[in-house]
């Protein structure tokens, strides 16, 4: 299994994303899933080494992820990784969780899924596995036939986990764009919002692991 598929497999289920940061619960599992691939070792260095704190800050302020990436890269090198290996560790995280510039889809797995009725319905187009949203995709929600919400994210077994680019239609008239990070369908940390010429943050529950 490739490293991206392995990470998403590890994140399946209740608190899967959070448990990924727990070495007792996840340590060695990526190596097992990937057959001992070097990428698994690099990713675990990001999760469990000096860069861990910068990674958590990045999750809680995803709009400014590039700033935290610079810090994390330096901390990975302090842990003994080369500049190229440190860059690769971050690329793996960005790809697994759909950050801008890292959203390539496997076209062989792209499909459309619909759900709901005339009062509320959803349309999903993106990567699908075993009949569920799994991978990069976009979902549009409709209220009585009119769009009301849009999410572009990474889905893991039907649940959003990753960098979120969303749009809301508030009061049936005002479009609000939101950029942040989602864990188990819940926005975490600071979500950057744009409404007309206004910019502001919505503060959600911070993601934190010991």
Where are these regions (language model features)?
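Charged, amphipathic alpha-helical regulatory modules used
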Residues: 1-106
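Glycine/tyrosine- and acidic-biased, solvent-exposed loop/turn segments at the edges of beta-strands
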Residues: 105-210
């Amino acid at each position: 299994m490739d490293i991206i598929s392995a990470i998403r497999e590890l994140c399946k289920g209740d608190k899967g994303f959070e448990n990924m940061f727990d070495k007792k619960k996840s340590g060695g599992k990526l190596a097992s899933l990937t057959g001992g691939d070097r990428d698994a070792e690099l990713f675990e260095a990001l999760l469990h080494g000096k860069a861990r704190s910068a990674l958590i800050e990045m999750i809680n302020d995803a709009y400014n992820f590039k700033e935290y990436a610079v810090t994390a890269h330096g901390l990975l090198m302090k842990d003994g990784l080369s500049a190229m290996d440190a860059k690769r560790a971050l690329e793996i995280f960005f790809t697994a969780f759909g950050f801008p510039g890292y959203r390539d889809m496997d076209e062989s797995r792209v499909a459309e899924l619909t759900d709901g009725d005339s009062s509320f319905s959803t349309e999903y187009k993106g990567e699908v596995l075993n009949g569920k949203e799994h991978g990069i995709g976009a979902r549009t929600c409709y209220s009585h036939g009119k769009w009301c919400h849009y999410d572009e994210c990474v889905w893991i077994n039907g649940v959003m986990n990753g960098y979120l680019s969303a749009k809301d239609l508030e009061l049936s008239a005002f479009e609000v764009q939101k950029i942040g990070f989602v864990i188990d369908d819940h926005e975490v940390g600071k979500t950057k919002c744009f409404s007309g010429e206004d910019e502001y943050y919505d503060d959600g529950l911070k993601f934190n692991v010991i």
